[in-house]
């Protein structure tokens, strides 16, 4: 039961395996092969099972299953096994039938029978052939082959038909084809009638000579060999030793270095003199330069070393190197060393480097030919010539790859030709010229109108000094247009300039130098080139546009074109401070200077209410030290006379006096014109004092780049600038300070208007000047009344020049703006 279940399981597994593999191995032209669901898929037709590439196994399953005695011949059809028939399939087929249920007829009958399953014929004796159709010809002493018909004779008979008897010893047999006797061992002769006498060794059948067995020798094989190894000669008994042994009896092994029969062969080049195999002669490893199993083959040409893995160097004419070491026997010219790897030393060349090189100026000689190989940039036999134009490199052998054909003789980099150099020069000069033109234009734009040659000081270096004044004045005018405030971070000490005049009021101004690059801490600098420190101190006061002088509004000269006074931008013209003697003679207001001090109104009064209207002017030195009393007495001419016949212009204060003395913001460079005057008009009985506050001193920070450029520009133009008279802008008449006291008392606007009417010069055409780094407020110059003042000016100009008397120029009366 278990066996049946096991067989059924195996059969099912086999069925599944065949079904799984049938789709991939079937032949489309095989038996019972059908197409599947797709054209490319093949499968067995229903009722058939795959076998190899066809479907030749029928399937009988279920109700159509066959019994044990039956086989399935077609799907669902069972028959008896071949050779049987009947209801139980137990009866054998008759001789003339074969196959399933004995349905096939046997063609061999009656001379043979068919095989039940295949139908092959089995012939009866004396018949042969495929269907047993041929009778045998062997007679009674032989049998024929059923396939071929050849006769097999019985012993003692021979011939093709087995009809001839043999003529041999009965114990022997004869050849069936020839009838020759074949003797058994120990017998010899034509009929095998003689016995051999060879001591158990066979003898030759035709001659009876003994053929000795191994270990025996002699004519009758009666002598035993004495060899330990190998075989002895059957005739002489000498031992034939096997490879690796030698001696009479082959009892000795081969000596080291030898191998083979009788140890007659020598070993090859085994490594470290190792012995080779005494039998074969093979080496475990070979010496360098040898190859092969027996190390008897040298390395192929071009190789050397162990196992011939090294490559030979380049020897002379390509000859092979030594197979063991790789050394060259000879080297090519220009090389040295065992492997010809070292070039000739400097100064030698040729075969074996035995020749001396010629002199090469810029290069080395060729190690082979001895010719000079020039360095880059040189050529010639001795390398003493530079490369011609258009070539570079070693021996000047490479042409230049440049548009103009010129290149560096060593590196080959392109160099500029005539056109390239011109383009480079133009490219450099054009920006420089543009920059220079910009600087010149900037300088002329900032310098304003040049001074008339007669207005320049006559001391040495005055042109350069006045040029610097123009530059600083232009910058200061730019700063004056800005509102009160700080433009930088310079901190300067306070300097107070007080003016005492009962007739002319002054505004109070906080003044700052236009440049931070003062050379010293002096309050007022002199011309650095003049050498005179105490004369002609120039000051500069930038005006404010909103400050309109009262005299200009009230005077009749205000109706003139442009007004009777210069415009605010012309009020910045520098003027020299007059000497005390000149002030006394001209009845000018006395001016006193105190450096480093600060005057403030006391007891609630403004600076215009100071005590005495009559003060002696003091001359200010560089160190702000007073002059000796004797000198002051000499220069002083007495008390000033105050003109009370005309009313002085009313001056109003634009701010609180207390605020006028407030500290400026730190580092201020702006002119902070915060005017400070008295609240009421100036009284005739008491003298009015106007105080001007100025910032002076050495800055705490270095000058900026803009100021440095302008300062250097002034130094450059010091010797370049020639005095030229500008005819386009006429200068107003210079008004010298009168020395007679009779000239005092006229109104400031009257004389000035007369002078302008006589010269027909507009006040706004008056040129502006610059101070030498210090700004000051202009004091009002009161011209003398009457027409004689103009004549006196022309007569006294020469006298004032000789005395180098400082003059006032383009003085604008400063008044407070009108009250709103």
Swiss-Prot record:
Keywords: Cell adhesion, Disulfide bond, EGF-like domain, Glycoprotein, Membrane, Phosphoprotein, Receptor, Repeat, Signal, Transmembrane, Transmembrane helix
Chief location bin: membrane
Region listing for Disordered, in residue ranges: 549-685, 715-820
Family matches, as SUPFAM superfamilies: Growth factor receptor domain
InterPro entries, per database record: EGF-like_dom, Growth_fac_rcpt_cys_sf, LE_dom, MEGF10/SREC1/2-like
Acidic residues bias (residue ranges): 631-648
Modified residues (Phosphoserine): 590, 607
Disulfide cysteine pairs (residue numbers): 60-72, 66-78, 80-89, 102-114, 108-121, 123-132, 166-174, 168-181, 183-192, 221-232, 225-239, 241-250
Chain ranges of the EGF-like domain: 56-90, 98-133, 163-193, 217-251, 304-341, 353-384
SMART domains: EGF, EGF_Lam
Biased composition (Polar residues): 650-662
Membrane-spanning ranges: 423-443
Expression (tissue specificity): Expressed weakly in brain, spinal cord and dorsal root ganglions.
GO cellular component terms listed in the entry, alphabetical order: plasma membrane
Assembly and interaction partners: Heterophilic interaction with SREC2 via its extracellular domain. The heterophilic interaction is suppressed by the presence of ligand such as Ac-LDL. Interacts with AVIL; the interaction occurs in embryonic dorsal root ganglions at 18 dpc and induces neurite-like outgrowth.
Domain comment (free text): The cytoplasmic domain is necessary for the regulation of neurite-like outgrowth.
Entry function: Mediates the binding and degradation of acetylated low density lipoprotein (Ac-LDL). Mediates heterophilic interactions, suggesting a function as adhesion protein. Plays a role in the regulation of neurite-like outgrowth.
PANTHER family per the UniProt record, alphabetical: SCAVENGER RECEPTOR CLASS F, SCAVENGER RECEPTOR CLASS F MEMBER 1
Protein name according to UniProt: Scavenger receptor class F member 1
Name of the gene this protein is made from: Scarf1
